[in-house]
Amino acid sequence: MKSVLKIRMSAHDAHYGGGLVDGARMLQLFGDVATELLIMNDGDEGLFKAYDMVEFMAPVFAGDYIEVEGSITEQGNTSRKMIFEARKVIVPRTDINDSACDVLETPIVVCRASGTCVVPKDKQRK
């Protein structure tokens, strides 16, 4: 089972100079993917317990399109182990003009993570 979201980073997402987006934004998107996976798997939003690993691999800027994918890799009674990957798939080309963008032939992996979510037994509906 997997979930995929695609979202454009806005000027509001930019936190640092040069339009750089805070890495925590990727973790927020991983949380959204995890929530969708838990709803699909258990019929409940569940709770994110912990990240086992987070690796930031490339910068993200306002205007970038990010595709976020996650999947459940292990399932216990209440725990769900998951992996996540965020990839930059479209980038602005302000060097050409203010509205130009390119679809990347090869997406750039910007962040990877793994973690554990929990759905209490009494809230599992599937």
From Swiss-Prot:
User: What CDD domains does this protein's entry cite?
Assistant: hot_dog (cd03440)
What reactions does this protein catalyze? Answer: (3S)-3-aminobutanoyl-CoA = (2E)-butenoyl-CoA + NH4(+)
Say if the entry is tagged with keyword Lyase: yes
Give any GO molecular function from the UniProt entry.
Answer: 3-aminobutyryl-CoA ammonia-lyase activity
One example of a Gene Ontology biological process annotation: L-lysine catabolic process to acetate
The UniProt keyword set, sorted, is: Lyase
Top-level taxonomic group:
Bacteria
Stored Pfam families: 4HBT
Q: What is its EC number?
A: 4.3.1.14
Give the metabolic or biological pathway.
Answer: Amino-acid degradation; L-lysine degradation via acetate pathway
Q: Which family does it belong to?
A: Belongs to the KAL family.
Subunit composition and interactions: Homohexamer.
Report the protein's function: Involved in the anaerobic fermentation of lysine. Catalyzes the deamination of L-3-aminobutyryl-CoA to produce crotonoyl-CoA.
The protein's name in its UniProt record: 3-aminobutyryl-CoA ammonia lyase
What species is given as this protein's source?
Answer: Acetoanaerobium sticklandii (strain ATCC 12662 / DSM 519 / JCM 1433 / CCUG 9281 / NCIMB 10654 / HF)
